[in-house]
Amino acid sequence: MDKEMTVNGKSYTIIKLLGKGKGGYSYLAESGNNRYVLKQIHHEPCDYYQFGNKLEAEIRDYKKLKEIGIKMPAMLEADVKNERILKEFIDGDTIYQLVLEDKMKNDYIEQLHRMCALLYVANTNIDYFPTNFVVHNEEIYYVDFECNDYMEEWNFENWGVKYWSKTPEFLQYVKEHS
């Protein structure tokens, strides 16, 4: 890919696209010997989600989740003009990849339940989809910063858990996105 992008005037080499979400494109980027995630906010329509200012929401949500105590990458910089965020890169497989490869461990779900205990007390849900979680040194990290007010129908037990094993919902998603 070898493209350059800047964050607050500093240049980063884009290595590859990591993924596209509701709010932006996340790239693996490097500068010197360090690797980062560089997220470029996009303004593509999303038929199932309403946004305000996406960059402001990312910053606000990051601060909220950090205060709650959620294990996640550090937000290193926010470039308001270019609508970009620079995050710490957490190296590891996503929960999605581990489910696909039959490498899931009960401990990862137990860790998520501990995360949920912190979130629910704070009246908060996160996006429990398995692509948003990376395992590094046997610990799960929430690598998205999105959070919302708690709604029972969207909590882990009622929605997220459907995608943390090879359920019909998970397999349907794989079929539609392969």
Q: Can you describe what each PLM-predicted range is?
A:
Residues 1-15:
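Juxta-kinase regulatory segment immediately upstream of eukaryotic protein kinase catalytic domains
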Residues 14-17, 22-55:
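ATP-binding glycine-rich loop module of kinase domains
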Residues 36, 71, 85, 141-144:
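Protein kinase-like catalytic core scaffold
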Residues 50-68:
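The N-lobe alphaC helix and its flanking beta3-alphaC-beta4 segment of protein kinase-like domains
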Residues 51, 70-109:
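Conserved structural core of kinase catalytic domains
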Residues 108, 120-125, 136-178:
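C-lobe/activation-segment region of protein kinase-like
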Residues 111-118:
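Conserved hydrophobic core/spine positions of the Hanks-type protein kinase catalytic domain
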Residues 128-133:
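Hydrophobic residue at the +6 position relative to the catalytic HRD Asp in the kinase catalytic loop
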